[in-house]
């Protein structure tokens, strides 16, 4: 039911309609797995036109709905929602919104994430079927030409694309399902005045899926083919498409076998004088039909028989009659009858007799009576001819549908299904007959389903579930359905059957009887009886039906003469089309057409009521099939009879989602920690309380849901989408947990491997460098004094100190500037000096860079030119050109490369000279000529040998050589026979724990227990419970939960480390209890000092002290100043070291036993001599020393903020015997006053102890 079936031309285009979101309509379909694209912010998102959901309208009225649809239609937005009911307006043109890119954008998305679209309805149906295991159906309604067939095809397209399945049988099923569209459209669709591709039959396609949501089969049920179209059409309409396809594009084989000619040659295809459809290529459509037959699996013989029947129908229509002398019908052209007999493979005489003579029998007393042959007049003969044609085509169409179902039979068990109903729309013509009555009756039944499932059922359910609800008034069309189908009181169909039974011989008499029966319906407010016609007030409007010919159309029975004719055929396919044998003795009235359509409609309703429905309401914007025309009046009429306004009101006042407590809990129990544990259902209460708990734990507001008697009602779809998103996220979180644990384990393994590798490299990686260092001793052969630093055990011959061989960094810049080839291996690089001779001045060392490769020696200069650094190779010497290397026997770093060329030999000063000699000997493969003597020889000019003398100078700097006037002054070095010291042992440090991966305790191996282990258990593990009203799954017995363990105290690292190296003597399953934790170590003691003299600060960074004050030592400097802090005020500052006496805390001794009580003694009497002695002592007190001249510089030292005052430690306090707890600045009493000599002795002993510790550290180094 689209606008057109195929554009003229070879390229096949989409038949869809709607706004395109992708510019390229011709993108090919991407096979394979769907590509998940990275989410991006849509900066170019188009602004919404109107409202995309009619429930968001500020004013609810038919006019407001019409205005919104018109606004969106004018901007190519043809889809609009009413909740999850989709309203579609046919634009009669292809806007390219059904491309693969657009389809992928709706994959896995809910309704609110994407704009309204038929793909969204298909996605929702497929998701609900797969997630909730409920059968789904999509009911597409609307009048003829509104786009129902197009919507059905797009739903099939989407489901076939997203349903997955890489198996060949599943793909074959998809292909066959899609192939049913062109096949059934060719045989079941036709051009009408309102629609170029109108479905003239009803189709319910049921897609069958397995448990994985993959299509495994399908089944098609067809309803009431309009077979009268085979023999006649009104002007500007066509017969079924297949007749024009066959007559225009039949291959020569069929033209020769079946005498196929152009459509103008046949009465059945030329009566309406309409042979073509604008924009439709019948030749290309016929190729699609043949291809679809092949995909379905029709053999060539089956296809030949199908087209044989089509040719027979066309030729039967060309049989003409004329009156003979008796006024009876006679065949005008016997050759046509002969060819029809050839096609049906019957005797031509039997064809002649069946079309012109009717056999009648008389009954006598229940026995068979006489048989009479009654000639037919021309009118009766034409009716018999047309009846034969209609019967052949009707049965042929049923056979095609059955053949398709046979190919689509499921090959594996079916779990669920999705049904798609594509049935003819409501029709109102100038002359409406029995066909329109049946079509409109079926649409009334569909409207009744919509009312029952969306309006009435929704309100009834709210009342039944005791939900707070405001009732909405609506029109229930059940009265119209009863008017047509009821038997008591008799309806239209009952009156029609009665008329056919009582006046079956004469069609005119039967029609008059039918009119008389209709008078009994005159009291019905939805019915009006008029002269020769009657009016039924349908939901879509009042329709006037003509009574003429209705009884004949309702009989729908083939004369026994015609049944005998086809029964005598020699073609087995004809017998397949007419399988029932003629029962001559059967006197029962066969079912009429109205009986069949009523039974089919009721079966369809029963099928739809078993599934979860989705609705698409199609609207036809105009009757002219014009692309941009919007007829406001026509659309407003459709809005009214479709009941969109009532649907919007109920949707806004109702609930978007409702589900029984059991299914709700089964779906969402994972979202609450109280109803699930590790994926198991653990709730022990009933389903209703479980649902309440889930909604509570997911923080759903109370106004967003209501609890009914058996169901939970969720008000807005956003809430449901939020629950679904949280449920999906639960599984993502579980997967992330597993992934995180695995990645932690991998990180732990990698970290352990890295540590082993690091240790191995540290142990063995330096061996090669040590070999090179030892080789340097062999190069010198004990002929040259050594520097002390060269003999350190930690010395390694690394070679490329400047990183010339590295990629990036300054080394690469030097390499590029010097032009060093990338193929050269860098053996050595270092900064040094080269002796430069200048005219008129003495030679002077100048900085250079020395680079040794496996082929050259480069002397690289760095020069500033216009404040720009320029790097260039000042001298490039091939190593093969070096004849000798000359150096002195002292420890200096000078040597010369004797080349003997036209340029002077370079005299170089390099601190890593021995390493250079070693690498140069390696590059020369041991052919290095190293000259060691008292003088260094080199060619200052070509052929002019010059010498540089090296002398020992005790006054020279120990680490720097001095060159002056061809003399090198150097200090005495180590003996030439010296060798390198052994490699020092690494300083003992605490083992660093492996913390990556979070698999070990925070302290690492032997460390404290993990945080998880020390944290008390929150609750015991709950037992899994069976889901409500479900069979309990067989599971392994789960042990009873153990009581939560009491957390153990965290042991100290020392004790834990010791425990980690202790082997457990018992291998039994019961472990011995852990030893009690050791006592906590005492707090670290703070270094303090006692002020010996008063000191007044002269600068802001110095600290004032008074004699007897006790201050805390923050740091000690070697320049005679200590950084101290006043323990009372927390003020820091510098104090002269000579003014302080460092205090050493006494070692605590065990408390002695209490002394015996002493006898009381008299208080001493103060004498005058005591005061005099004190005054004398004050006069004899030595003067304080002068502070160091070099005061501390605070500019380069970062200020240390004063720490907060800490509680005094009595073990460190110098006034520990003072129970009053002074500030430390008070004068010590006479019993604790130490002499100055004693304090200095204690300070010396402390210093000696500290120095001893430093020496130990050096040894460890």
Curated annotation (Swiss-Prot):
For this protein, the record's Gene3D superfamilies field holds:
1.10.10.820, 1.20.5.4820, 1.20.58.530, Kinesin motor domain, Myosin VI head, motor domain, U50 subdomain, SH3 Domains
Q: Which residues form the Myosin motor domain?
A: 49-728
Q: Which Pfam families match?
A: Myo1_CA, Myosin_head, Myosin_TH1, SH3_1
Summarize what the UniProt record says about post-translational modification: Phosphorylation of the TEDS site (Ser-370) is required for the polarization of the actin cytoskeleton. Phosphorylation probably activates the myosin-I ATPase activity.
**What InterPro entries is this protein classified in?**
Fungal_myosin-I_SH3, Kinesin_motor_dom_sf, Myo1_CA, Myosin_head_motor_dom-like, Myosin_TH1, MYSc_Myo1, P-loop_NTPase, SH3-like_dom_sf
Single Gene Ontology BP annotation: actin cortical patch assembly
- Domain IQ residue range list: 732-752, 753-778
| Domain annotation TH1: ranges | 786-973
Please give the residue positions where the record annotates the modification Phosphoserine: 370
The Gene Ontology terms for molecular function here are:
actin filament binding; Arp2/3 complex binding; ATP binding; hydrolase activity; microfilament motor activity
Region (Actin-binding), start-end ranges: 417-499
Q: Using the UniProt record, give the first listed, main subcellular location.
A: cytoplasm
Keywords, A to Z? Actin-binding, ATP-binding, Cytoplasm, Cytoskeleton, Hydrolase, Motor protein, Myosin, Nucleotide-binding, Phosphoprotein, Repeat, SH3 domain
Q: Which ranges are annotated Pro residues under compositional bias?
A: 1019-1029, 1038-1052, 1072-1084, 1147-1159
Gene Ontology terms, cellular component aspect? actin cortical patch; cell cortex of cell tip; cell septum; hyphal tip; mating projection tip; medial cortex; myosin I complex; plasma membrane
Feature: compositional bias, Polar residues: 1212-1233
Q: Which CDD domains match?
A: MYSc_Myo1, SH3_Myosin-I_fungi
Give me the stretches of Low complexity compositional bias. Answer: 1160-1181, 1234-1243
Q: Where in this chain does the record put each SH3 domain?
A: 1084-1145
UniProt subcellular location: Cytoplasm, Cytoskeleton, Actin patch
The entry marks the following residues as binding ATP, namely 142-149
Q: Which domain of life is it from?
A: Eukaryota
Q: What note about domains is in the entry? A: The myosin motor domain displays actin-stimulated ATPase activity and generates a mechanochemical force.
Give the family from UniProt: Belongs to the TRAFAC class myosin-kinesin ATPase superfamily. Myosin family.
Per its record, how is this protein called by name?
A: Myosin-1
Organism per entry: Aspergillus oryzae (strain ATCC 42149 / RIB 40)
